[in-house]
Amino acid sequence: WVEPHAEGTTPMYEAMLRVRDMLSDWCSRSENRESFPPIVINITDGESSDCDDRELCDICSQIRRQSTADGNTLLLNIHISANNTIPSMVFPMAEELTVADHYARTLAECSSIMPDVFNSAICQMKGAGATPPFFGMGYNASIIELLSIINIGSRSVSNMQ
């Protein structure tokens, strides 16, 4: 749907506007009404250069509200940061975000809360002590963790039951 493009700044608001408009168009088509809802995987440095935090959270909320008869769009944010003083996080719980920097907390707020049907797979991946709700995001995830996010986030619900 979208060709990736990297160039200097991070116009995340503009990118999310385009995503919202594409999803709105796709979800409104009658042939897509009964489809599995869209999944958006945003890979970013987390430092939007064209809006403030509130504007970013608002546009992401609009994206998450795009829906089909089967549910709302799932927005997963993958935050790649130069700040390696914070441990990597995958599907973080709220308490894990207390050690995160401002950008990671903002992206968590922009992300979907993972639907209940995914909780068992996420708990199994995270291990002991993992309790929902989980934010649909990763922070400085390893390639294995990144693939786990994509794998869990893109499974159809029928494969989860």
Place the predicted regions along the sequence by residue:
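Acidic, low-complexity intrinsically disordered regions
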Residues: W1-Q161
